[in-house]
């Protein structure tokens, strides 16, 4: 196990991710899901292939897949851009949370002016102002409506089922939802996901794991302890926004005893797809109460990776701990030996196992 070579540059590779998380209300972190927030840095992903996405580049988008506007990019970025009323390459990031059909998506643009321009373009089409709790809300149909005559697989505002979109400008982003419900909460995201102490600790670790002078975060997911507790009731282990950390610790301890071998229970984490020194990598950063526990997690994740991830056995595994305020992050980076295309074989192995419920690297349990 080796740590990371530290970079003299004080840049921050998590800047765009933090910008996205600042727009999302912290209440999202109480959702009983393993992956609570999804994120794609459009500019980082597009930098992998200047000519346009290949099949490998498209397949790489396994973390960001649930974000609604990305459902329409498989038919090419040009038709997507024409229907979206904004060039794909002018989008800074996409983010989202929740499950279809009630999932919420965020379109991050370069500034407020770009947001105003896009809203004006949408109003020239079939979007119009609608009444709601949040001023500035526009929609292209009634709540829950599907208009098959307007269905268009290449249109991120409609999709193949012609679903309605409700859109709200928020600072330098647009929120896209399938109804006006909850827009009042979304319009005032403070305290945000980025304001969460445990998420901030995970981001501090991620910043170390992806050096800004040599690497970029392509996609990321904010993960909860549910990722490592396949057999445990999610509601019992989540630290709600006004939750009691001591009760959460007790519940986690009980869950650990029921779950078998694994790493110490973490509060929150980030699973990131990155490109570092032109090589695809996966970086995992988990928030802990102290660095002694975080060190156990680094060792445990590294050992579990070598033990269970046969499909990525040639990958280089490195880890470290990062003090983050009162908390400490356990950071493990797994880098592919070479970049054969625009894909990420390490991420593919992680997501394939995750989908089959066989991703045990983050399993919470008694020390290995």
Model-flagged regions — what are they?
Residues 4-10:
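Sec/Tat signal peptide C-region and signal peptidase I cleavage site
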Residues 11-102, 108-368:
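Soluble, non-membrane globular domain cores that form compact, hydrophobic packing
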